[in-house]
Amino acid sequence: MKKFKSLALVLVSLISLASCSSSNNEKKISLTYVNWAEGIAMTHLAKAIFEEQGYKVEMLNADVAPIFASLSRKKADVFLDTWLPVTHKDYMNQYQDKLEVIGSTYENARIGLVVPD
């Protein structure tokens, strides 16, 4: 439930952010995603929520490096699958003055082998 609340908070923040940046009454947003199951799911959920709010949503599938470059050049608006503090740390350091982290769905994300207790 805690993860769901965090995701909901991030999505509400995204809608607020997108509302501030829309011009000429045209509500558009571009969502980027990589081919990872959780990223695809979160991005499609965000797409559905934005469409319910009247946004025209563009979905952009790419690898991580081009996504960060696109975000930094304002060619894309949102990437929901940044793994911090470790996995995407170098990208965040490279583009930190051009990107804004507005929320988190999972704190201290790590990649590795997992063995249940």
Region locations from a protein language model:
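Bacterial N-terminal signal peptides that target proteins for export
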Residues: M1-A8
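C-terminal motif of bacterial Sec signal peptides marking the signal peptidase cleavage site
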Residues: S16-S19
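Bacterial signal peptide processing site
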Residues: S21-S23
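Envelope-exposed proteins and targeting segments
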Residues: K27, Q53, A109-I111
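A conserved helix-loop-strand patch within extracytoplasmic ligand-binding domains
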Residues: D97-D117
